[in-house]
Amino acid sequence: MTRRFCILLAITVLSKCTGFSFRTSNSCTHRRMPALHHHRSSSTTNQDEAIKELMKTHDPILLFVSRLLDADIARDASALYAWCRRLDEITDDPSSDVATIQQRLSDWERRFDMICRNEPVDDMDRALAMYVQRNDDLELSPFVDMISGMKEDTVQNRTISNMAELDEYAYQVAGTVGLMLLPLLKANVEKSRDAAIALGKAIQLINILRDASPDVALGRVYLPQDMLKAEGVSTEDVLQLKSSPEYRKVVATVADHAEALLIEAEMGKSTLPGVGPLFVQIIVELYREYLIKLEQIGYDNLNLSGERVKINTIQKLMASFKATTKVLTQK
């Protein structure tokens, strides 16, 4: 999740540097807290330091990127980062069993309710509470949707029933991050919301196809069960890394769906001023390279080494060049 957050924060940095301005709708599922006082205080300093330490430990590059933002925007983006990072730590804790992780995530839902009631537990919660208060147009449902997706992901031998369920999961764990960041961009939701969600979902679907082998090692199969069954492929076949022509056909179908989402995101980039369209196009082309790589290897994304599908530095540079050329020729 934090990797997706880094991508979206980079877009935020770009957008604020180029004067990109957006607005979001007022669609919330939780009761908002009483007004907070925003003057600089020792409490605010404690919040900043707590989150900086978290970034320094886990994502030092992101800490550097956050310094490119003005103070208020950096503080809000960092508060969102801390929320996502600490959720990751709950689900990635190797010492916890499924029941414990599920309980901790339920506790985290209640904790978010407390944030909305201005009852933060610690300094990092307080930072998020201030972000919520400063942005009346912030949608609160994505915070809960993300936790729901993470709960489902903790189930042993995780499977997905159909494409609709896969789309919902991709929204929960990736599209939600974009919605959380929209207030930082001041986005016009009618013009940008669907494209932003499409980009997040595409990134997640491509990550699933890219990371199939390491996911199998964790007992997780994210390809739709109905599609596998229609091709005569069982979950056990996938867990045993049997990459049959029928299995690869399902991979190709999901890859086509991811490409359609990339196209939707690509079409939505025209609403962005400045160099915003360029950076969206770069992300689209980078992730499209994974789809090209999958096609080149015959959609065989299972291997005994447990490694994910990779693209090299030259491919990444070429994707960036391709994106730049596309944007410049479209002007």
Residue spans of the language-model regions?
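N-terminal mitochondrial targeting presequences
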Residues: 19-22, 33-44
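A composition/secondary-structure signal for short, hydrophobic, low-basic-content segments
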Residues: 26, 33-35, 168
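Catalytic cores of Mg2+-dependent Asp-rich isoprenoid enzymes
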Residues: 43-202, 209, 213-331
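Absolute N-terminal positional cue centered near the fourth residue
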Residues: 1-5, 36-39, 275
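N-terminal chloroplast transit peptides
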Residues: 1-29
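Intrinsically disordered, low-complexity serine/threonine-rich segments
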Residues: 18-31, 308, 315, 324
